[in-house]
Amino acid sequence: MLTQRAHSFLCALLMLTILPTLAASAQTQPERIDIWSGTSVRHRVWLTPYLAGANSTAVIVCPGGSYFWHDMDAEGEQAGRWLQRHRISAFILRYRTAYVPAFVLHYRWLLRGNRYPDALNDLRQSLRYVRSHAKEYDVDTTRIGVMGFSAGGHLAMSAVELLPRTEWPKFVIPVYPVVTFVDPCMHKRSRRGLLGDSREHNRRLCDSLSMERHVPENCPPVFLVNCHDDPIVHYHNAELLDSALTARHVPHQYIQYRTGGHGFGASEVKGTAECRQWKTAFLKWLQELFSYHESLEVREEEDPRPCVCADHVSSYPETHVLYRTV
């Protein structure tokens, strides 16, 4: 048996081994920003910052999850760290969703729960917060955009279609987005998640929240991407939005990859090598958008099969590109 002295020595040695690891972990764990201080939702909604400093561009990231839950990995933390590596400050928004119990129990026939416009109010508040704290976080207020994945892409577009123009982000990045609530290609789970069981078939509400129907004049530039083989959100959603942006002469770039599926986010392993090229394409688009004097750190990634341009007008900001891989 160990003597008391030996036992104490081993405990001290163990603590000396573990504490530096815990301290390092605590230092690398991003803080959470309370954007609804003093309200009943302050513990359910927050921003997680990944700061780049140097008066950087900022992107508020809306993870997807059918308005029922969040993918805080590939569409959250990994997206934040990727943007930060490329000198873009990211703020990952955990917005209100219906959550799993509402998905399973359908209790929103009787109770309100979380539903529209809760998530939009959270995004609106996050835009206000980042702008008002721009000096503290060292971001440029003229270069604050919104990125959204899947249902988060619907939320990102809602910021320019449903908020006052004075509160619009400067650019929007919908990635494999949910777009329509009226077309046969709609993603029904996202519609139910956003509207609730008692309102998901309300025609007027569904129409007003179909992003392809309400693209505003002078809409900020949009970078739109999806995959033709998406098994979750039908690829036609993005095509509807692309057509609407084109009809409104909105400066945008649309890339549709042949393979990649859904939910790859900013992951280095999910999806396909082909679809993961969207990150490099986006960085180049953003660099051109703001005509940076300092170059973004755009790292070339593995080369996909060649893309062909289906529709292209040469000069930005009127560039409209539809890429399809062959």
Language-model regions, residue ranges each:
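Short beta-strand element of the alpha/beta-hydrolase
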Residues: 56-64
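Conserved alpha/beta-hydrolase "acid-adjacent" motif
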Residues: 231-239
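Mobile cap/lid helix-loop segments that gate and shape the active-site cleft of serine hydrolases
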Residues: 38, 177-214, 220
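Short beta-strand/loop motif that positions the catalytic acidic residue
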Residues: 218, 224-226, 230
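N-terminal cap/lid segment of alpha/beta-hydrolase-fold proteins
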Residues: 27-54
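Catalytic nucleophile-loop/oxyanion-hole region of alpha/beta-hydrolase
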Residues: 71-73, 78, 94-141, 270-275
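C-terminal catalytic histidine-bearing segment of alpha/beta-hydrolase fold enzymes
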Residues: 101, 108, 239-312, 316-317
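Primarily recognizes the serine-hydrolase "nucleophile elbow" in alpha/beta-hydrolase
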Residues: 125-189, 206
